[in-house]
Amino acid sequence: MENKEKKQMLTTKLTKEKNGGSAGMIQDMSINGIKLQVFQNGTGGPVIFWGMYPHQQNEVEHLWESLLELVPEQNFLLVAFQVENWNRDFSPWEASAVFGKEGFAGQGLKTMRWLTEECVPHIDRTFGVKDREHWLMGYSLAGLFALWAAYESDVFSGIVCCSGSLWFPDWDHYVRDHVVQ
């Protein structure tokens, strides 16, 4: 049995134990080259889209387990999507390097278009969740991306910005000149 299969089986087993024996659904998929992990707890509740970097794989499972522990009766669908390049794919516009040597390529709009035009519709169709609340969350630069998405799109009814990179060059000017959708 491959490592990935063992990991998925372990996650499913943990889900069954923490959820009183009823397994939540866990599914890996890819949409236009971007990897997703989808965790479903129950049949209702919000759809939470979480932008993350590929090396944070265990973070998805940790969040899943934490949610089941904190609010075991809350139904939700968690969709973790993995960008290829953190500074490129989550930055709303180009900016020089702030920490280290790598600058910000400003491809956030491309990521948001993929998210709102491909990912969200696919998840809505596949899981029948079009009428449920859709939230976007992220940590650090992905948190800034989530907040920026609130100004650029009306797809999400809620935003979770954890320790967002609000230091990002010209963010203060952007917020002053734009309105949340």
At which residue positions do the language-model features occur?
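Non-catalytic cap/lid and distal C-terminal segments of serine-dependent acyl enzymes
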Residues: 6-181
